[in-house]
Swiss-Prot record:
The chain crosses the membrane at residues 8-26, 47-65, 86-104, 116-134. This is Protein rexB. Residues 27-46, 105-115 are periplasmic. The keyword Transmembrane helix applies. Keywords: Host membrane, Membrane, Transmembrane, Transmembrane helix. Its main location: host cell. It is a multi-pass membrane protein. InterPro entries: RexB (IPR031892). Residues 1-7, 66-85, 135-144 are cytoplasmic. It comes from the Viruses. Signal peptide: none annotated. Disulfide bonds: none annotated.
Length: 144
């Protein structure tokens, strides 16, 4: 069972590694850029983005569960559907955290790295959404 769950966990972790490396490179090569000057606009944008992506994920998951292709039947038969559902579930959690980071940016809390954390989560969630769309396309198309 572990071999069937771990691919989903890896798919969730890999974008965070990519975003962390990009953050370190960004900080090294462009050290003067700061996103904390316009926290209210950033918070509103990220909260709106998170809410929209949650709606898209609900639609994608509904489409995936309702799809009746041979490829998806094999994935269910071999037990790998658990990994797919784990990726969707962790993406929902990630977008929920991003939504609340956006709300914290709208509040008067300052002194924390909330803008940096929120942009990192948003970047990783965008990569996750791209992976899920690619996965949805591959799982639901008919084989030629």
């Amino acid at each position: 069972m572990r071999n069937r769950i771990m691919p989903g966990v890896y798919i969730v972790i890999i974008p965070y590694v990519i975003v962390s490396i990009c953050y370190l490179l960004f900080r090294h090569y462009i050290p003067g850029v700061s996103f904390s000057a316009h926290r209210d606009g950033l918070g509103a944008t990220l909260s709106s983005y998170a809410g929209t992506m949650i709606a898209i994920l609900i639609a994608a998951l509904t489409f995936l569960i309702g799809s009746r292709t041979r490829r998806l039947a094999k994935i269910r038969e071999y037990g790998y559907m658990t990994s797919v559902v784990i990726v969707y579930a962790l993406s929902f959690v990630e977008l929920g955290a991003l939504f609340f980071c956006g709300l914290l940016l709208l509040s008067s809390i300052s002194g924390y790295m909330i803008p940096t954390i929120a942009i990192g989560i948003a970047s990783a969630s965008f990569i996750h959404i791209c992976i899920l769309v690619f996965q949805l396309y591959n799982l639901t198309r008919e084989q030629e």
